[in-house]
């Protein structure tokens, strides 16, 4: 429970810093949800898909010879989904509305991912 509460606290801070964020999910690299605030049953589905997208994105970065993956951004007609590796064990997915300041989203998303990685490392 403590891990979930600490992760949710960081995700709440992200929403406060980036008003266009409409929700987020943190999950393990295996796709198991840790915490989330997306509507309906989207958290579990998003967690499972996020793990797969992260794995594919890491592979693409490696194949392209471009170093370690920092983020994956999905740009859609009604907004954005950004995925961040939060250390070796956690994936953070952030959903944002159209018109979101992508520079701010990327900056704050990375900060939140780093905070989640630190939380996870203290749990071991």
Residue ranges of each PLM-predicted region?
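Acidic, low-complexity cytosolic segments
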Residues: 1-21, 29-124
